[in-house]
Amino acid sequence: MSSKRVTWLSLTWVLVFLCLSVELEAQLQVGFYRTSCGLAEFIVKDEVRKGFIRDSGVAPGLVRMHFHDCFVRGCDGSVLIDSTPSNTAEKDSPANNPSLRGFEVIDSAKARLEAVCKGVVSCADIVAFAARDSVEITGGLGYDVPAGRRDGRISLASEASTNLPPPTFTVDQLTQFFSNKGLTQDEMVTLSGAHTIGRSHCSSFSNRLYNFNGTSGQDPTLDPQYAASLKTQCPQGSTNTNLVVPMNPSSPSITDVGYYVDVLRNRGLFTSDQTLLTDTTTATQVRQNAGNPFLWKNKFASAMVKMGQLGVLIGEAGQIRANCRVINS
């Protein structure tokens, strides 16, 4: 091999190494606030704990908040921004209002962090930390959260409607939707397991009870006994928009594989839950998750980390909001 070729190859490897180094430096990092705000993750965890004691529903709310944040414009905290007279923000989209909850936990954590580390910890990172802590406090596995996200300046209700999968989606639609976000079909099935905690408003699934596919009947794939119970809790023609039911009646506050067990019993609450059995591959994944709790919890933690890195703002992009509800002036 000639000396010129050796030199060329050496330079090529140097350039590759430098490019990789720059890319790695630009990514999120575990322990990002270790020196700039060492108590950051502890403070968020403490606020999640206090919120959970007041209302256990806060935990599933915060997990869902992280998902809804990341799928719209990336994980930039835009779901936290309040609407103004001139703009309807994400949180007031029908996909989020009135179902999203846990905002007060984020507010409390941010207020404490601003008191000890002014202008350091982003709202987007607080949401990511709070989601992790919510998984852990409900019995899931804790996991390291790479941080360093910056906060976005734009929040549009219209974007929430087009970037969040509705509860009526089929397995093919879900697979494509998650693929568009860079997530695999297996990760879609894994993250769907978040429905093992929390609640749903009756309006999100009432079509399965009273008007399935434009008929006057109920969804034939829905377990009859479960359907009867749901009809009791969600009477036909009710004008009460606050009626809710647990996603997983047997253990609504525990992060376990109850969701997958329910789906196998034809007790998935949403069409988008039960549809997982209509595809050979996803049905196999449902059965595997139902029978391997520890495996699913590990997969769920990994999928949450990956989801938490969607479309993030880093470096000098975005801002660090002083108030998570308001864009800095």
Swiss-Prot record:
Q: Which InterPro entries match?
A: Haem_peroxidase, Haem_peroxidase_sf, Peroxidase_pln, Peroxidases_AS, Peroxidases_heam-ligand_BS, Secretory_peroxidase
Q: Which Pfam families would you find in this protein's record?
A: peroxidase
Query: Where are the residues marked Transition state stabilizer as a site?
Result: R64
Show the SUPFAM superfamilies listed in the entry: Heme-dependent peroxidases
Keyword flag Membrane: no
Which cofactors is this protein said to need?
A: heme b; Ca(2+)
- Cellular location(s): Secreted
Annotated positions binding Ca(2+) 2: T196, S251, D256
Q: How is the cofactor bound?
A: Binds 1 heme b (iron(II)-protoporphyrin IX) group per subunit. Binds 2 calcium ions per subunit.
Location (main, coarse): secreted
Q: What is this protein called?
A: Peroxidase 5
